[in-house]
Amino acid sequence: MPAPTLFDYSDHSPYSNPGNHTGYFSELSTDPEELHRFACSVVVHYRAGGPDLTETQKVDPDRRWLTSILDAAEMRAPLDGPRTHAQQVAGCCRDHTLLALGVLRTHGVPARSRIGFATYFTPGWNADHVVGERWDGDRWVRFDPELDQQDFDFDVHDMPTGPGSPFVTAADAWLAIRAGTADPAAFGVSSELPDLHGKDFVRYYVLYEVAHRHRDELLLWDLWGPELGTSYVRAAAGGAVATWVAEAGLPGADMSDAEFDAVADELAYLLVAADAGDTEAADQLAELYREDVRLHPGERVLTLSPTGHAAITDLATR
């Protein structure tokens, strides 16, 4: 099975499709600074918003479809005008990036999201993060639509890549941890959240990176496959998750820890090789992702949201 092509990346996924807002998106600029301003006008980070979030905003982080984000934003204020904090949609880096992808793809620009860790928010900490990449005609240009250029000493619209770069892909992070050259305890959401940092956290982010590369831009709290068998997930929702997963027939929960490690190794090596231009590796990755039902999301996933919402989500019916 071939890897996604530039044509595929220039077309909308179900997640990035702006739906009835397509006409408005076709009028927006694809200039990187304009993308930043638009994304950060529509979406405020749910953690940065903190106690100031309204009751309506507190359910926003579970909006996985761009149409839902835009519908909510438009109900609160016109999309083409200024908006107050309370009129923004609460989301995260994934949503800022999805907005940018939506604009770029509407204009036929190949674009994709990348999952990994940012070194530029807290010294010594690799914060889980989502950024974008756009094709400029010759190469993939990495950018962070969440960042204001004046606050950073690197080009946020054409970010450095490779060893020592400010954004570490999940694949690179995993391979560094496996090689013993990176401290797994320094990767995740927060060092104060034991279930949301460390080796296992990076491991399932490799799975997210593969999914997003193949245009399945799910929420960072949508879980499937071997993620369903981890102790953190099994203990969620008062221990009810195992029953939910079994009743929903979701595959992969019985994958052993050792097998999950080996699968993550293979996926990470293929991701890194594909990034380096190895088309065979990219095709092999795509085939592995599509053919192994444990590695890609099916019609249903388990959602364990930071809002406290926990349920089996039917992606087919939205």
Question: Which positions does each model-derived feature cover?
Answer:
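Substrate/cofactor-recognition hotspot
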Residues: A258, A268-R318
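Low-complexity, intrinsically disordered regions enriched in charged/polar residues
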Residues: S29, E33, D60-R63, R83, ...
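His-Asp-centered catalytic microenvironments across diverse enzyme cores
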Residues: P2-S13, H36-T56, F117-V130, R134-E280
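Secondary-structure boundary elements
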Residues: P2-Q87, L99
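Functionally constrained cores in energy, signaling, and assembly domains
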Residues: H21-Y24, P32, S113, V131-D136
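Cysteine-centered nucleophilic/redox motifs
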Residues: A86-I115, G132
